Regions:
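Alpha-helical membrane-protein topology signature
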Residues: 1-232
Length: 232
């Protein structure tokens, strides 16, 4: 029996984690877009998150196809299909409600046009890698906007901690995989993603503790007040 190499272990582990993250991300997006059957105002960073994810997956899909990387190709293919269907169907319903057909038309054209151009001109090692890295780094923009809102509002519930921890683990696995196969294009975005995700998890922990201590303090004050009233 042939021993399984480390790059295959971390490659498939990273791919499986990424696919699971795609599913959880879409589930979170659906719950955010719909509350008891009614549409609500969606923050800008949540509107563009899955669009950026689509561009990331489609660019990595072409890159992995050209360079014959089965681990990247499998998760990128599933991610591209998931986010494409999400944008076409869910955004179609949402933008119909707010009458933004021009915006929707732009999104649909971008979904078809950008991957076509990337495939038409083809990838080379010097061009394809930086394009994927650029899309990947841009996709962290919604996370930074969300983190900014968390810091301003001190509302730790904006951070989905389970999804955050999954992303943290996935970034770590992809980093190790990229390090093993010596691919800087995989290493760079996952180092940046790991840092942003770790900072988000840290703020979630900090603000949750502060919220818990404030609730405990308010409860103590209320108990003391009730005791004083009872004594009087």
């Amino acid at each position: 029996m042939m021993p399984v190499s480390a790059d295959k272990i971390f490659g498939w582990l990273s791919a499986c984690l990424s696919i699971f993250i795609f599913i959880v991300s879409i589930k979170v997006s659906i719950s955010s877009f719909r509350v008891k059957g009614k549409y609500k105002t969606i923050p800008f960073y949540m509107r563009i998150e899955n669009i950026l994810n689509y561009f990331v997956c489609s660019s990595w899909l072409i890159y992995s196809y050209i360079f014959n990387n089965i681990h990247l190709f499998s998760c990128s293919l599933i991610g591209t299909i998931f986010f494409f269907l999400w944008i076409i169907f869910i955004y179609l319903i949402y933008f119909r409600k707010i009458s933004c057909f021009k915006y929707l038309t732009f999104i649909i054209l971008a979904l078809i046009y950008i991957p076509f151009i990337l495939f038409l001109f083809g990838f080379s090692w010097s061009i394809g890698g930086p394009i994927c890295v650029t899309f990947n780094i841009i996709s962290f923009f919604p996370s930074i906007l969300m983190l900014k809102e968390v810091i301003i509002t001190k509302n730790y519930r904006l951070i989905k901690i389970k999804l955050n921890l999954l992303k943290l683990l996935a970034h770590l696995c992809w980093f190790i995989y990229g390090f093993i196969i010596i691919n800087i294009n995989i290493v760079i975005p996952n180092v940046i993603g790991f840092i942003i995700t770790f900072v988000s998890a840290s703020f979630w922990n900090i603000f949750k503790k502060k919220s818990g201590s404030e609730k405990l303090s308010n409860r103590s004050v209320e108990v003391m007040r009730n005791r004083t009233e009872y004594t009087i």
